Amino acid sequence: AIIPNIEEINAWLGGGENTVIRSTYRPAIAEFSVLRSSGSGVNKSVRLDMHPHAQQRQYSIHGFLDRSNFQYVNPQTRRTKTYTFTSTKALAVGAARKVLSMGTTAIFAANKRGNQGAIGLAEELIKQLEYPLALPNPVDYADIEALRTRIDYLETEFGAGWIGARSLRNGAVLHHGDIPQETREVLEELLRDRRIQLVICTSTLAEGVNLPIRSLVLYSVQRRV
């Protein structure tokens, strides 16, 4: 597990400098990438720059996200429309949906509320799913039967309109520090058992929890107060 205050815990257990074990070992290869935008409005195109650091092998995936991913046909007018995808929030959610087929994906936000918060990301996801966009739907990667009892639990505890319950109905876990511990454990179990493949979270999820996350989308990294 990831322990952010290992020195304090070591001291509390009566240990010394030599009793803290540090290792650079990683059980899996970590690959880094950055979204780079060009153009504006509906003509915006986003490429994925893999290994953006100079000392690593670099390559780009052009057109990783563009207008084609956000177009849909209006059922009333039968005209093709484009969902607004110019915001960083829309692109973060779109990128996470794009890589869902690779495995469990997390979208990280430094805050739970505000313009750069996890709750806003959950609202953006739900908004996107109201339209038939050409992006993977999280529900298609979830165990619907397993979700049903958890959705009932969340709706009973917090109400059907709570953003966490609405997120789970749409195939995503919302996880942050204001959610009671016992509820977080229920949600973490879904991720651990691979019953769901999308989670929107803050640093609370990383503290003391090992989960099978394949891709991590960093939406915001600076905590605002």
PLM-predicted stretches and their roles:
Residues 37-45, 154-156, 218-222:
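Short, charged low-complexity intrinsically disordered segments located at boundaries
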Residues 1-3, 200-205:
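Ser/Thr-glycine-rich phosphate-binding loops at phosphate-binding pockets of nucleotides
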Residues 13, 220-225:
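Short, intrinsically disordered, charge-balanced linker/junction segments flanking boundaries
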Residues 25, 204, 221:
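Short, ordered loop/turn segments at secondary-structure junctions
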Residues 208, 216:
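Conserved P-loop NTPase nucleotide-binding/switch module
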Residues 83-85, 89-201, 213, 222-224:
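Conserved C-terminal RecA-like helicase domain
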Residues 2-11, 17-124:
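Conserved interdomain linker/interface between the two RecA-like ATPase lobes of SF2 helicase motors
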Residues 10-18, 189-193, 210:
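Short, surface-exposed basic-aromatic patches at helix termini and helix-loop junctions that form
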